[in-house]
Design a protein with these regions (language model features):
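Active-/binding-site microenvironments in catalytic and ligand-binding cores
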Residues: 1-203
């Protein structure tokens, strides 16, 4: 190369707000809720609670995290602390990127054949009414389980002004407590969600 030559690389990027590892802002299922750019940064840095339901999910791919799962965790580790981010470890990350296993089907657009774990309606209500959390997360495509058609968990969590993180990778590397999550969503003005880089800080 001559002194006047240089290397230059550039690309074009586009994506859904709700594809890959991403955040669901309250407005996604709550009219008038916060958009992704309005979520305070302080809410995106949080101590985590990791509820391991992978054994149950291996037996039932439509398993939903229950109130019993939450109270069993609390018997071992104490009450879920205020300001926590509650993460459901289903073990589903091991199936990525095989859509047939991860989603239950590799047929594009056919929501009638989706099968993967999620949060139960009762657990979502418990977390919103009985605990003071800032959000939930899961290593599947949705906080609602695959066969859901009404997305009631979304309605409860986001309707309470909380946020959700979906398609989280490597949850199997986090302990039940003591980790801090730093969620870094793309700051899309007016966005209902955004691709998100998630960093875990361990003690």
């Amino acid at each position: 190369m001559s002194p006047r030559d240089y290397w230059y690389a550039a690309g074009h990027y586009s994506a859904s707000e709700h594809g890959g590892t991403h955040i669901d802002a309250p407005i996604h299922f709550s009219r008038g809720g916060l958009t992704v750019d309005q979520i305070p940064l302080a809410k995106l840095i949080a101590p985590t609670v990791v509820i391991d339901i992978s054994e149950a999910c291996n037996k039932n791919r439509d398993y939903r995290l229950s109130v019993d799962d939450l109270t069993t965790w609390e018997k071992q580790h104490g009450q879920i602390p205020d300001g926590s981010l509650v993460l459901a470890r289903t073990g589903w990350g091991k199936y990525w990127p095989d859509k047939g296993h991860y989603l239950g089907s590799d047929v594009p657009g056919d929501i009638n054949v989706l099968h993967f774990p999620g949060f139960s309606l009762e657990a979502a209500r418990f977390l919103v009414t009985r605990r003071k959390i800032i959000g939930v997360g899961i290593d599947t495509a949705s906080m609602d389980y695959g066969p859901s058609r009404l997305f009631e968990v979304h309605g409860i969590i986001l309707g309470a002004g909380l946020y959700g993180l979906e398609n989280i990778a490597h949850l199997d590397s986090l302990p039940p407590t003591a980790a801090t999550i730093v969620a870094l969503p793309m700051r899309i003005k007016g966005g209902s969600g955004a691709p998100t880089r998630i960093i875990a800080v361990l003690p």
